[in-house]
Design a protein with these regions (language model features):
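Glyoxalase I/VOC metalloenzyme domain signal
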Residues: 2-53, 57-87, 92-206
């Protein structure tokens, strides 16, 4: 069982117990930090300069997804649950934020599985916010980030661009995902860029 002590322990013993259960399900939190930091270092990204708006997990069975959903709701509120590409994806706002790489992050994304088998279940990626410039199109935003971080020239990175469309969302939410090509080090995590804080995207729907 994977567990760790809360980085910012307080008198909320219920949340501390929840955190222990969460890391037992999702995996070693400090290892997740190390893996994300490794990707950022390879890509030349200073994460302290960007907002980390949410963390995400992955699993290989609907049964596990349902168990994790129940577990999260013990110490979080459901921010939103949407159908994306034929599967439900839930966003949960924790009652107490997690300290992730010196940032306070309180949203966890939990998507139900859809056929793909992940080599490792649990913590999978983070998303950082890189806002659009004035009058910038999606294509220009993508091109700017690829050029800024030289993503197309870094032989150690895999790059995936996507534009998921969620019913009701009014703000465009393209993403650029980067991960390490060399998986011999067991780093199966991913770092994603997108232009809006996920909470702003949700608020824009109402």
């Amino acid at each position: 069982m994977c567990a760790m002590i809360l980085k910012n322990p307080d008198k909320n013993s219920e949340f501390a117990n929840f955190f222990t259960k969460m890391t037992a399900c999702f995996g070693d939190f400090s290892l997740f930090e190390q893996q994300i930091n490794e990707i950022a270092t390879v890509a030349g990204i200073d994460l302290s300069q960007f907002m980390i708006d949410h963390l995400a997990v992955r699993m290989n069975s609907v049964e596990k997804a349902e168990q994790w959903r129940i577990m999260l709701l013990v110490q979080s509120e459901l921010l939103k649950e949407s159908e994306v590409n034929g599967r439900p994806i839930g966003l949960f706002t924790l009652l107490q934020p997690l300290n992730f790489l010196n940032q306070q992050v309180d949203v966890i994304e939990l998507p139900f599985p859809k056929g793909k088998t992940y080599p490792q279940e649990g913590w999978e990626h983070i998303e950082i916010v890189v806002p659009f410039l004035a009058d910038e199109t999606i294509e220009q935003w993508i091109a700017r980030l690829i050029k800024q971080f030289q993503l197309d020239q870094n032989e150690r990175l895999k790059v995936k661009i996507s534009q998921p469309k969620v019913e009701g969302e009014r703000l465009a939410n393209p993403s650029i995902a980067i991960s390490l090509k060399d998986e011999t080090n067991q780093n199966n995590c991913c770092l994603k860029f997108h232009p809006y804080d996920i909470k702003l995207i949700v608020r824009s729907e109402s």
